[in-house]
Amino acid sequence: MAIREILTVPDPILKEVSQPVDQVDDDLRELMDDMLQTMYAADGIGLAAIQVGVPKRVIVMDLAGSDEEAKPRYFVNPVLSDPSDTLKPYEEGCLSVPTVYDEIERPDRIHIQYLDYDGNECEEIAEGMFAVCIQHEMDHLEGVLFIDYLSRLKRQRAVQKVKKVEKSKDRDAA
C-alpha cells in the first residue's frame, strides 16, 4: 500500500468526470487500498479516486469515529437514486479543499447501488452522515466539488485560501 498525493483546487483534474470501472481486479483493489491508506493519513472520512488523479468511479470511506475500530467501505461504479425530499444542512469539508468548511444542504436519505471490494453487487439505503458523505464523494466522480454549491465569492475565497495554504507548505518544505 502507498500513500498517494491528494490533488487540491484549482487542479483541473478534479473537474474531470470519472469513467466506469470494467472489472474489480487486483489492480483496482490495490488502488482502493492505496486510497484508503491515503484517506486515513489525511484524517479524512471519504476519498474519490479522482482526488488522487485516477479518473475511475471508485470511492473509499470510513465513518468510524476516532475511538472506534476502522470500518472501511469500498464503492465501485456507485449509482445513487431515490433521494429523499428532506434536505438537511451539514458542514462539509474536503481533502481537496483543505481548511475550508461550509454548510451544504443535501437529501438526508438516498439509495445506492455499487460493487464492493470483491466485485459483489450491493445496494442499500444511506442515511445521515453516510448519505452526506456518499453524495459528496459522488459529486467528485462528476467533477463537482462541494465549494461549487457556494456563491461565486465564497468559492473564490476558498480557492485563494487553499492556494495560500499550499504555497505555505511548499515554502516550508523548501
From Swiss-Prot:
Fe cation binds at C94, H136, H140. InterPro entries: Peptide_deformylase, Peptide_deformylase_sf. Binds 1 Fe(2+) ion. It catalyses: N-terminal N-formyl-L-methionyl-[peptide] + H2O = N-terminal L-methionyl-[peptide] + formate. SUPFAM superfamilies: Peptide deformylase. GO terms for molecular function: metal ion binding; peptide deformylase activity. One of its GO terms (biological process) is translation. The keyword Signal does not apply. The active site is at E137. Keywords: Hydrolase, Iron, Metal-binding, Protein biosynthesis. It comes from the Bacteria. Pfam families: Pep_deformylase (PF01327). Its cofactor is Fe(2+). Its EC number is 3.5.1.88. Belongs to the polypeptide deformylase family. Removes the formyl group from the N-terminal Met of newly synthesized proteins. Requires at least a dipeptide for an efficient rate of reaction. N-terminal L-methionine is a prerequisite for activity but the enzyme has broad specificity at other positions. This is Peptide deformylase. It comes from Maricaulis maris (strain MCS10) (Caulobacter maris). The gene is def.
